[in-house]
């Protein structure tokens, strides 16, 4: 079976002269994911196989995460990593609490009303602030924006890829 990879960030530039790289993070758990000693996998442009690296340092700088890898000690080496996607295999995903889900578990789920009517399919998840917002593609209609809050999301079945929601007034207005 093919190994499934999950995107946790992208190297967008270098930082300084000692091989640090500037990362736009795509993980909900940067402190855990980028902890020194952790293995990450870099998918470089034009390369078929990922390159394994080990985090030696992590810090925040403005809106970026700065990472140092044990295998990268110079600016010249770090330059070669620009635009690389940082991924981890499925077996490195953290265990979540019972009512928490990874984006890949939610995207693709069919969304139903409490009455059992199909509303559409989750195609994207937005993270604007206080709570996530699920973008639900509806056949022949405008996408619906569903807030991930207890008052709306009533049931999630990851195994069946189904979600049941309470339709509050105005939620699905055209």
Curated annotation (Swiss-Prot):
Subcellular location, record wording: Cytoplasm
Main subcellular localisation: cytoplasm
Domain PRC barrel residues, every copy: 98-171
UniProt KW keywords: Chaperone, Cytoplasm, Ribosome biogenesis, rRNA processing
Any one of the GO BP annotations: ribosomal small subunit biogenesis
Protein's UniProt keywords contain Transmembrane helix: no
Keyword Cytoplasm part of the UniProt annotation: yes
InterPro entries: PRC-brl_dom, PRC_barrel-like_sf, RimM, RimM_N, RimM_N_sf, Transl_B-barrel_sf
Pfam families tied to this protein: PRC (PF05239), RimM (PF01782)
Gene Ontology MF term list: ribosome binding
Bilayer-crossing regions: none
Domain of life: Bacteria
Annotated GO CC locations: cytoplasm; ribosome
Family assignment from sequence similarity: Belongs to the RimM family.
Domain text: The PRC barrel domain binds ribosomal protein uS19.
HAMAP family for the chain: Ribosome_mat_RimM
Purpose: An accessory protein needed during the final step in the assembly of 30S ribosomal subunit, possibly for assembly of the head region. Essential for efficient processing of 16S rRNA. May be needed both before and after RbfA during the maturation of 16S rRNA. It has affinity for free ribosomal 30S subunits but not for 70S ribosomes.
Subunit structure, interactors included: Binds ribosomal protein uS19.
Protein name, per record: Ribosome maturation factor RimM
Origin species: Bacillus licheniformis (strain ATCC 14580 / DSM 13 / JCM 2505 / CCUG 7422 / NBRC 12200 / NCIMB 9375 / NCTC 10341 / NRRL NRS-1264 / Gibson 46)
Taxonomic lineage of the native organism: Bacteria, Bacillati, Bacillota, Bacilli, Bacillales
């Amino acid at each position: 079976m093919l190994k499934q990879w999950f995107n946790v960030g992208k190297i967008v530039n270098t930082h300084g002269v000692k091989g640090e790289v500037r990362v736009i993070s795509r993980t909900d758990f940067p402190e855990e994911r980028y902890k020194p000693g952790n293995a990450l996998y870099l998918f470089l442009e034009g390369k078929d196989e990922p390159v394994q690296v080990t985090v030696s340092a992590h810090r925040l700088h403005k809106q970026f995460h700065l990472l140092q890898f044990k295998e990268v000690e110079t600016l010249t080496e770090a330059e070669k990593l620009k635009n690389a996607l940082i991924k981890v295999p499925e077996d490195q995903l953290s265990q979540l609490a019972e009512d928490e889900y990874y984006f890949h578990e939610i995207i693709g789920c069919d969304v139903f009303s409490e009455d059992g009517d199909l509303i559409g399919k989750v195609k994207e998840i937005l993270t604007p602030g206080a709570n996530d917002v699920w973008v639900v593609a509806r056949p022949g209609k405008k996408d619906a924006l569903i807030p991930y809050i207890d008052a709306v999301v009533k049931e999630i079945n990851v195994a069946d890829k189904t979600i049941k929601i309470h339709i509050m007034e105005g939620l699905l207005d055209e």
